[in-house]
Amino acid sequence: MKSRHACTILLLMSIPAMSVVAAETIRFATFNTSLNRNKAGALQEELEGGNSVQARKIAQILQRVRPDVVLLNEVDYDSSGKTVQLFRQQYLEVSQGNQPPLHYQHTFLAPVNTGIPSGIDLDRNGETGQPGDAFGFGRFPGQYGMLVLSRYPIDEKRARTFQKFPWKKMPGALLPVDPSSSEPYYPAEAVGVFRLSSKSHWDVPIQAGENMIHLLASHPTPPVFDGPEDRNGRRNHDEIRLWADYIRPSRSNYLVDDHGQRGGLARGAHFVIAGDMNADPLDGDTVPGAIGQLLDQRKVNSRQIPASTGAVAFRDTGANADHRGSARNDTADFPDQGPGNLRVDYVLPSRSLRVLESGVFWPPAGEPASALLDASDHRLVWVDVTFK
């Protein structure tokens, strides 16, 4: 298949083409599946034969919620697309827990920065070639990758990726400073090659009848695992900021994608921002206001907050007791000793779309579906939208 993308973007269509009837409602979702392994090829090997317990649970969750378009975070990337095919054909398209099989005719897959060596000692531990020295933390290229599945056609020719965008090119970038010297934390050689995106930022155009919706997909770095310089917190902030600038024509001219196209979304374009943003609006360790760059943006429809009853019951002791945010909006079950459960996964439509319903897949303890929750420490978040 020909593609203008040199970075091996795959539009996989192993299923015969099937028309999607224009529907009044489109369900978008994001789900950090934790389908990552510590060795390249290990996930693909595990998926062979359809017997992975974790993957079967992930597939059943998807079959229960049945999103039309879903971003999956933390699915190890392989350039052949074999891992995706195995998950789709041997898990999603096979009934799990008596749920109807789920078919996605369109898949978007592209490389990510995790595990790609930078050649520089980025974490300043005296060694190079370690996971913390990659452009995004990872033990091999593609660990913690991303994947988009869609019932609606994907306009591959108009898809854009920002995997290689340099952090220093962002005006006013929050590049870290060494508090002990007030000097830049990263040496000039590191700043010269440092990529903003810890995985990647994708603009995936979804063709819904005569309308186009841009799925803006990413997975910013966790704002922890660093020191007083807060290098990961600052990067997380600016990874989120990329989308806040991208959706505003007056702020996006500095952005250049991996194929040299400048600028962001056209004025009036429909979009849905999705992903594990690793940022809670009130709690956790993020730079203050990080996710507010999106939640408070007038182009974003963020009033209806996805919620669940199960999350309330999971609000245990420890760090959760001091949280300011409502437990019903949490999307991740993190350790009680810290940071506690947080709202870090988002599906944020543009105001040009009408939000009908939303939710978080977090069934209360005791319900049969609660047995699926140990498949990941994150919960699937979904939002139903329609055109105004």
Language model segments and positions:
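Active-site metal-binding loops of divalent metal-dependent hydrolases
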Residues: 33, 74-75, 152, 220, ...
